[in-house]
Amino acid sequence: MSAHDLKLEEIVNPETLRRKLNELADSTDENYTSPTVRKVVLQALKDALVRGRANAEGMLMKDGGGTLCAKRLSFLMDTLIEALFEFATTKAYPMINPSKAENMAIVAVGGYGRGGLAPGSDIDLLFLLPYKQTPWGEQVVEYMLYMLWDMGLKVGHSTRNIDECIRLSREDMTIRTAILDARFLTGNRELFKTLVTRFDEEIVKDTGPEFIQAKLAERDQRHRKAGETRYLVEPNVKEGKGGQRDLHTLFWITKYFYRVKTKEELVKLGVLSRAELKLFNKAEDFLWAVRCHMHFATLKAEERLSFDIQPEIAQRLGYTAHPGQNYVERFMKHYFLVAKDVGDLTRIISAALEEQQAKHVPGFNRIFLTFSRRKRKLSADGDFVSENHRINIARPEVFKEDPVNIIRLFHLADKHGLEFHPEAMQSLTRSLKLINSDLRENPEANKLFLEILTSPRNPELILRRMNESGVLGKFIPDFGKIVAMMQFNMYHHYTVDEHLLRCIAVLSEIEHGELENEHPLSNHLITTVKRDRNLLYVALLLHDIAKGRPEDHSVAGARIARRLGPRLGLTPTETETVEWLVREHLTMSMVAQSRDLNDRKTIIDFADTVQTMERLKLLLILTVCDIKAVGPGVWNGWKGQLLRTLFYETELVLTGGFSELSRADRDHQAREALADRLSDWPKDKRDAYLALHYTNYFLTVSLEDQVRHAHFIREADRNERALATMAKPHTFEAVTEITVLAPDHPRLLSIITGACAAAGANIVDAQIFTTGDGRALDTILISREFDTDDDERRRAERVGKVIEDVLSGKAHLPDVLAKRTKPKRAAKAFKVEPRVEINNTLSNKFTVIEVEGLDRPGLLSELTGLISDLSLDIASAHITTFGEKVIDSFYVTDLVGHKISNATRQGNIRRKLLGVLSGENGSKTNGRSSQAAA
C-alpha cells in the first residue's frame, strides 16, 4: 500500500504541525510549561485531531477503504504524538547535556502498534527507558499523558526499561502480545532496536507452542463471552467470532511461530496461498471499514453492530435493496460471509501450524495429541485414514480422483465419530470447484448426504462442518443462497443457515430423549413416527431455504422441496409429505398462538389443513424445533401448552372423537385431577372452587398452574382481597409470569396491560380467563430482566404493585404511562407496516380482528381501550410478540353478541385501529379496555 493510496497529506502535515506548535509557543513571553502556552498548544493539537478525523471520514465515505482509513488514523495519531514529544523534550523540558539515563523511546503497542486505528480506539503507548525512570523522564511522560487525555483520547500506557519489558513479557501473555506488535514512534531508536532483538531471542525463540496455546485459550474464552456462533445477528465486530480479533489472533500466532513481520511472508513460507492472502486482506479491509463507520456514526467506540445502527452503516457502505432483501440484510449477509472467511483462514493456518511441529499444542477447538501419529484406513480404497482420532485424506489427489469423496469425508467422520484433520479441511476448501451438477445428481453422493442429515448420532455437528467448509451451500445451491443471510428483525437471533442447523440439533435432542421434560409431547410422538423420521430432518433443513425471495418463503420452499426430494432418494409420497411440511411449517404456531383454541371452528379448520394424524404429529414436532431454534427465550412453557392443546383437540377431530361429550369428558378428568390435588380442602370449599372455572380454563391451563391459582385465589378470599397479584419467574424460558385476580369489567385488560407498560415490563404473552362469580384471572408473561429468581421475583412484585395501584385508583394510568412512552432503542431501527384484518370466517360466533404493527410501550392497552370505545366486546384476546413486531388477535362481537358484518362499520374499525398502530391520533392511552374472557 503506497503513500499515494493513503493520501496522508490530506490527513495532517507533520512539518506544518510542528512548526505551528513552535510558533504558538514562541509568540508569548511566558514559560513553555505555563498554562497559557499549554492551552494554545493543546488547542492546536485538538484542531489537528478533529480536522484529521473529519478528513479521514470523508475519504472513507469516498473510497470505502477500511484498511486505508485505519492507517490514516494511525498516521494522524503518530504525527500528534511525535509533535507532542518533540515539543515536550525541546521546549517544555529540554535537556542540554542529557545523561545516558535521560532519554527514551515512544513505542506504539497493542492494536496501535499494528499501525491501524478506528476513530474510538484506545491508544496504547510504551515509554521505553534505558534504565530506571528519571525526574526528567517523569516530567515528559506526565506532560504528554495529560495533553493526550485532555485531547479526549483514551490512552493506555506503561513506563518500563528493557529489562522490565523482558521480565514481564515472560510472566504475562498480554504484555508479551503487546510487545509483539511494538512499533517505534519517536525518541531513541536504538533503545527500541535493543528491545526487539532481546524480545525475539529471549522470549519468542522456542516458545511458539506455549504462545499458541495461550492465545487460542484466550480466543475461546472471548468467543464464549461474546457468543459462540459467528452468526449472531447483532455481532461484536471487534471481539465476536469471525471478527477483527480473530484475524489479529491468526496473525499473532503465525508471526510468533514463524517469526515473520508481514502477512506476505506467510505466502513465501507456504502457509497461505496468494488467494488466501487476498482473502485475509479483504476480510481485514471490510471489518476495518465497518468498525470505522460504526465509531464515526455513533461518535464513540461502539463495537456491537446492533440493530439500531445497522441501517446507517449499510447506507454508509453503499448497500441497496434487492428483490426479497432490503439493504440492511444484504449488508449483514456480506458481514457474515466475511466472518465465515475468517473461519476458513483459521482452518488453513491451523493445518500449517500442525505441519510445523505444533501438534503438541491445543489446536483450534481440540487437542493435538502428544503421542506419535497412528494411521488407520477408513475405506476399502484407502482414500481416507484415521490419524489420532481425526479423519484425513490419504493423499492430496483424493477429491480430484473422485469428487464423491467430498461427501464421503463427512459421512465417514460421522460414522466413526472422528474430528477433521486440518490438512483434510484445507484440501477440501481448495477443492470446492469440484462440486458441480454431476456431483449434485450423483445417486451415491445424495444417498451419503441423506444418511449424514438423518444420522442417529450428531447430524448438526457434521452439517455445521459441511456448511463452514462451503460444501453444503455448493452441494445444495438453494441452501447456499441463505448462508449468512440475516433477517432484519428482533425476533430471529441467528442467520437463516444457523437457524436451520439449530433446528436439526433440536430434533436430534428430542429423538435422543434429551428434552423429555421440556417437550414431553414431542418426546413421545418422535417414537411413533420412526418410519417418517427422515422426512422430518429433510423438512427442517428446507423449511426456511427460500427466505430472502420476493414471494412467500413457505410456498417457494415447498417448490424447492418438491424438486430436491427425488434427488435425495425420497419416494413421490415422501416428497409430497416434505413439500406439505415446508409449505405449512408456520401454520400450527400461528393457529396455536393467535387463534381461540376453545372455538370449535378453529380446530375444524386446522384439521382440514392437516388431514391425517401422521401429518399432525410431524408438524407438531417440526413446529417445536422451529420455535426452539429461533433463539434464547423465544420458547416458553405457555407456547408448549398451546401447541399441546391444539394437538389434542385436532387429534379428536381426525380420529372421529371430537364431540361435546369428549370435550366434557376431558373437562371432567381435569376437574377430578385438580380435586385430587386439593384433597386437603374441605369438600364444600373444593366443590365451590371447581365450579368457579369454565371448561376452557381446565383445557388450557396446566395442572400445576391450576393448583397455584387455587391456593392464590383461596388466600385472597381469606384475606378478603378483591384485588391481588402473584409472580413466578421462569428461569429457563427467560420470562416471568404475573397473575392478576380482580373484579371483571370491560376495561380490565387495557388497564392491566397499560400498568405493565408503565412499570417498564415488556409483555410477551397473555392469557385471559373469567370465573363464574364475576372475577377475572389474567396471566401476563413479561420478559425477564435479572439472572437470579430472587431479584426477578422482587422486580415482578413491583410490577404487580403498579397493577394493583392502577386498578385500585391509587395511581392514574395516563400519568405513569406518559413517563414510559419511549420505544426500545433497538425497535426504533425497524419499520413494520401496520395491518388490520377483520375476518368473519375464522369463527362461527365471533368476528376475529387481527392487528400487526411495531411494538411499543402501552400499545396493547391502546388497542383494547379503542376496541372498548368502539362498542365491541372482547371474548378472547391472543397476544403474540415477534421481537419488534406484535400480532394480536381479538375475538369480538357487538354489544348484543352479533358478528360485525356491516362493511361501513368494519371500515371504521380498521381505520381507527390503523391510527393506533401508526401512533396517530387514536393512540391516547387512558386506561380503557374491554372484557377479555378466554
UniProtKB/Swiss-Prot annotation:
- Determine if Hydrolase is one of this entry's keywords: yes
Task: Return the PROSITE patterns for the record.
Answer: ACT, HD
Q: Which InterPro entries match?
A: ACT-like_dom_sf (IPR045865), ACT_dom (IPR002912), HD/PDEase_dom (IPR003607), HD_domain (IPR006674), NT_sf (IPR043519), PII_UdlTrfase/GS_AdlTrfase (IPR013546), Polymerase_NTP_transf_dom (IPR002934), UTase/UR (IPR010043)
Q: Which SMART domains match?
A: HDc
Every HD domain range = 496-613
Q: Where is this region: Uridylyltransferase?
A: 1-379
One GO MF annotation is: phosphoric diester hydrolase activity
Quote the function comment for this protein. Modifies, by uridylylation and deuridylylation, the PII regulatory proteins (GlnB and homologs), in response to the nitrogen status of the cell that GlnD senses through the glutamine level. Under low glutamine levels, catalyzes the conversion of the PII proteins and UTP to PII-UMP and PPi, while under higher glutamine levels, GlnD hydrolyzes PII-UMP to PII and UMP (deuridylylation). Thus, controls uridylylation state and activity of the PII proteins, and plays an important role in the regulation of nitrogen assimilation and metabolism.
Query: What does its UniProt record remark on the domains?
Result: Has four distinct domains: an N-terminal nucleotidyltransferase (NT) domain responsible for UTase activity, a central HD domain that encodes UR activity, and two C-terminal ACT domains that seem to have a role in glutamine sensing.
**The protein's name:** Bifunctional uridylyltransferase/uridylyl-removing enzyme
The coding gene here is: glnD
